[in-house]
A protein has these predicted regions:
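Short amphipathic alpha-helical segment within the helicase RecA-like ATPase core
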Residues: 1-225, 466-473
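A generic structural signal for tightly packed, nonpolar segments enriched in small/aliphatic residues
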Residues: 160-473
Length: 473
């Protein structure tokens, strides 16, 4: 089965479609209502509280809908409307809210993964001509689709093919490195995927937002694409393995971010490195206490085969760093320790405490606050670095101590990043355990809006207001 990245945006109405109005208020009633309509809303118990939705009658059907926002000023205030309103085409009337963020909340909430079964009902459609909102919704849907795809549909070959398809869509050059070339150039990554009948590969995408490339800043994105993680010989228990199709969530996030950058034609040079592998058990699989060579020339001892994501990323970071990018970002569903510390909604952000690292971290955190897409910075605490020591290799893949797992994983990756480079590492969950307004259960592109907005700020791109992501919080 093929996994195509081509899709429409759920909840988006065709341009020029006839529509019904939606009036959103924070308290009381909309001023324009007739006396009869106002009496109907009062009788319905409408007060403007968050989550209230009432259809306003008209002699020939429905005049529109009135929605309560209460004090919620996030985009999630509008996140449930695509499924709270009847099927049809609607428009948001101006009110005390950010129109772009309201539209984005609507479209994000309209998303459903329906590759194998039809949706129970179509979402209510929204009219909007905000190109950035539509692009964010499309990029988010791309990432969600990739994470939601079952592992028998999305393996290493299909994830690499999705990268090629994305490149072709935006006029980028892209290639896939596999076989002997992958084993030679990305030996640690290759060792992770060697146990699967579906071989490992690296997909690389190059794109320039300016005609000749020129002196445009180089942004490099690296994504962990473990399409299924059994844990290897350190086998996961059944409950922990259940959702491991989502272990390529970092790659999905980076592809969604790349799609948004290219769609908005940011004046940057972009490189994307996707490590597409499957961590399985076989006679060819890596074993505990194996010693592996990395692209950087350093050797690592495999302390646990279920700590495979850092082996994928270390070779990708080395390759990306060779081009000396102005910004180097990686994303991965890397550690359970990050989830213990921060839960499912807050990706952990790591960056070196250097001028370049602090600048990146500060920009990402600020962007997360303004886009309602938060991350939380954890330290790359140098005092824990000795915990990676081993007598048989340059260092181990895992800590010798049963604590600070997310930090030690970040310290491992930092060894493969050139000193002084602007680098940030995102340890994400990539999943919504339960549905909420704007955030359906399943795959999620946590951090996408924050990272995009931070790239705009960090590269000093002078964009019109509509090309910047913002929400009042």
């Amino acid at each position: 089965m093929n996994q195509s990245i081509q899709r429409s945006v759920d909840g988006l109405a065709p341009p020029g479609a006839d529509s019904l109005p939606v009036w959103c208020v924070r308290a009381g009633l909309p001023a324009h209502l007739t006396a009869a309509q106002a009496a109907f809303l009062i009788a319905s118990g409408f007060t403007g509280a968050a989550g209230q939705v009432v259809l306003v009658p008209a002699p020939d059907g429905i005049a529109g809908a009135v929605v309560g926002l209460g004090e919620d000023r996030s985009l999630w205030a509008h996140g449930g409307l695509a499924h709270a309103l009847p099927e049809g085409v609607w428009r948001l009337e101006p009110g005390d809210f950010d129109a772009g963020q309201a539209a984005l909340g609507w479209l994000l909430g309209a998303y459903r993964y329906a590759a194998f079964t039809p949706a129970k009902r179509a979402p209510a459609l929204l009219t909007t001509d905000d190109a950035l909102v539509i692009a964010i919704a499309r990029a988010t849907a791309l990432a969600r689709d990739l994470v939601n795809a079952p592992a028998n549909v999305l393996g290493p070959a299909e994830l690499a093919a999705a990268t090629l398809e994305l490149g072709a869509q935006y006029g980028a050059t892209a290639q896939v490195i596999e076989g002997d070339a992958c084993a030679e150039g990305f030996p640690a990554l290759y060792a992770v995927g060697a146990g699967s009948a579906r071989g490992p590969r690296v997909a690389v995408l190059d794109w320039s937002g300016v005609p000749d490339g020129g002196a445009a800043p180089l942004v490099s994105l690296c994504g962990k694409g473990v399409c299924f993680d059994s844990g290897g010989y350190d086998l996961k228990p059944s409950a922990a393995m259940l959702r491991m199709k989502k272990d390529m969530g970092g790659a999905a996030l980076m592809l969604g971010l790349a799609a948004l950058i290219m769609d908005q034609r940011l004046p940057v040079r972009l490189q994307v490195w996707i490590g597409a592998v499957e961590n399985m058990v076989s006679g060819n699989a890596m074993r505990p206490m194996d010693v592996l060579r990395t692209r950087a020339g350093m050797t690592v001892e495999v302390g646990n085969t279920d700590a495979e994501g850092r082996l994928v990323l270390c070779d990708l970071l080395t390759a990306a760093g060779e081009a000396r990018p102005d910004m180097l970002l990686d994303a991965a569903t890397l550690t359970g320790a990050a989830r213990v510390a921060l839960g499912p909604d807050l990706p952990a952000l790591f960056a070196p405490h250097t001028p370049a690292g602090d600048r990146m971290a500060d920009a990402i955190l600020a962007a997360g606050a303004t886009t309602h897409d938060p991350l939380w910075r954890l330290p790359l605490w140098a005092g824990y670095d000795p915990w990676l020591a081993t007598p048989v290799a340059h260092f181990n893949t895992v800590s010798s101590k049963p604590m600070a797992g997310a930090i030690v994983a970040g310290l491992f990756l930092q060894r493969f990043v050139p000193p002084g480079m602007g680098w940030a590492h995102v340890d994400t969950y990539a999943w919504n355990d339960a549905g909420r307004p704007g955030r359906p259960e399943g795959g999620e592109a946590l951090g996408l809006r924050a990272l995009y907005s931070a790239i705009v700020e960090l590269t000093n791109i002078n964009l019109p207001k509509k090309s910047r992501v913002h929400v009042d919080v």
